Amino acid sequence: MITEIDAKLLEKIADLTGKPVGAFNIRKDSGCEARQSTEHIEITPKTDGKQGIDIRIKAGTKGEQCHIPVIISKTGLSELVYNDFYVGDNCDVEIVAGCGIHNSGCNESRHDGVHTFYIGKNSRVHYSEKHYGEDAKGQTGRNVMNPQTIVHLGENSTMQMDTIQIRGIDSTKRDTRFYCEKGSEVVVTERLLTHGAQEAESDMLIELNGEDAKGRVISRSVAQDESKQVFHPVMVGNSQCFGHVQCDSIIMGSAHIESIPAITANCPDAQLIHEAAIGKIAGDQLLKLETLGLTPEEAEETILKGFLA
């Protein structure tokens, strides 16, 4: 049964306000709340003893969506979930994931998710993932999420991956890996907000193995209060390829940010670029908004929203 709290979590992490269109699997408190397959997208529970599902998308599937959100409303719940995606050739699909935790007590609630993609040739996949946490009024339970995403990208295929950590995650360790074949392209946009005493680590590896493979990473983060962030993207060129890593961060209060981009070329025809910048909000930007009638707090929030948009 979907409660009012569940519905709010689903809207925040997957923009769902009712029953999803197309294939979906809604996981709630380590169980399946609802599941639906379609003619072209089949979702089945794992049979190897692991928690999780297999998603099989038939070759030639175009214009379809698949929603697989996870919500947790219990305190003290910890789970490790494996979801495997098999995307056929010549597909064009959107996959919407994400996890939301409403911690109802003082114990730690934790979701560790391992997503592995096997994407065929000449396909396009848009994958989005939002993470959000909150505590019930008066409660202090920690919210922890550790996502791992592994993508095997076939020839001439494209994956656009958008990841967002909205708020309320006390600790996260992200592990993202791409293995790109000939003519394939990956674009990763990571947006992260930490506050309080939260900690976030993000390790990313993109191997451009095939000729004319392309990779691009855009990381934007904001660290507030005493929070800590470490971002370590690695781009490896093993053939004639192009890769670009861009990391921009805003630091506030007594926060700590480390941005450690790395590029490695194992081929003379690999073209790899990395950029990293960390700074505070410029005073003239705040002043300009304040002259338009915004309070200092409203001006700051407006700038942060635009930066993370």
Language-model features: locations:
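C-terminal functional modules
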Residues: 1-26, 30
